[in-house]
Amino acid sequence: MTFRPWQEGDDLELLQIWPDAESTSAATFRASFAPDSDESPWRRTLVAEHKGVAIAAATVYETSLHTEHLWAYVEVAPDHRRGGIGTELLERLRRLAQDSPSGVVSLRSKVDVESDAVEFALAQGFKKIQRTRVVRLEAGSVPGVLLHQNDEGEMTQAIEDIATGSVELTQKVWDFYQRSHQWDPPAQTSLGRVNRLFLSDEAEAFGALVLRDDVLSARANGKKGDIKAFAVSYRPLEHDMPGFEVEDDAATEVLLGYDFDYPQAREAILQMLSPLAAQYPVTVEVTESMKDLSILIDQLIKMGAASVVENSFVVVD
């Protein structure tokens, strides 16, 4: 067995012996394999060869949004697993991490709950810090929840379209992201960069809805009601691939967020979900830290209105 740095063409060679990616996370990690870089983001990638044929790869890299850990990923061809190759690659990544520019050496990864990777990660000293699920909601499956109105029948809430370039929306997205990632706090960053990461054309965002509350009082003061929940829709990256055809039952990926301090957060979530999934299926990512959303998703799963399409753990060493 020989080990060497990643070089151009390794991805094509590995795809000849690797099966399809087991999850979206695995596909994303595969896309992160690249030659070593000392620029931002710093990266080191290794390849394991057996008799001159690439059979495994591993990478470790920094990110500017989450700086307390380095991302790490190891994948070995199924026919060569349980032979110590993954362990050797991980040990080499740990040694390479000693030279990261930030000085951070702790590793973080994401593993599918049903995969052998969980057992491997725990055996290598990693521990689970969060569970993440991608959940599919079928068209028309979410019960409708009426918007509030006052005694005169005037609406005190409103759902409206909002530009993805909105500073107000960007701030709400960032507030939600920080509150839902206290288990792995993001670094402080500008709203401009937040917009680029989550709401830009580059991020494949193509539309957004918001739920506003107390709109009558706000309007009387020349303002709009405060945003209590939001939903951002994304185009799948595969849309840019030549010959890609959208399946009839394809679901739209949605980032669903809400005000953690809003007493009626669960109701607000349903008020957003119902119109979103009225005619077409959607997928939503939910973590254990999103307690109100997680509880509602569990209820929808029990009702048969939702199903888990991906279930993974974030692990750190």
Q: What residue ranges belong to the model's regions?
A:
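Extended, charged low-complexity segments
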Residues: 214-216, 235-317
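Long, hydrophobic/aromatic-enriched structural stretches that serve as scaffold segments
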Residues: 47-98, 104-107
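C-terminal "cap" of GNAT-fold acetyltransferases
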Residues: 135-168, 296-317
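Conserved active-site alpha-helix within GNAT-family acetyltransferase domains
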Residues: 87, 99-105, 109-131, 289-307
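A conserved beta-turn-beta hairpin within the catalytic core of GNAT-like acetyltransferases
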Residues: 57, 61-72, 81, 227, ...
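Active-site rim helix/loop that mediates acceptor-substrate recognition in acyltransferases
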Residues: 11-59, 184-221
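Short amphipathic alpha-helix that is part of the acyltransferase structural core
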Residues: 1-33, 145-189
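Conserved acetyl-CoA-binding loop-helix of GNAT-fold acetyltransferases
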Residues: 76, 82-95, 123, 261-279
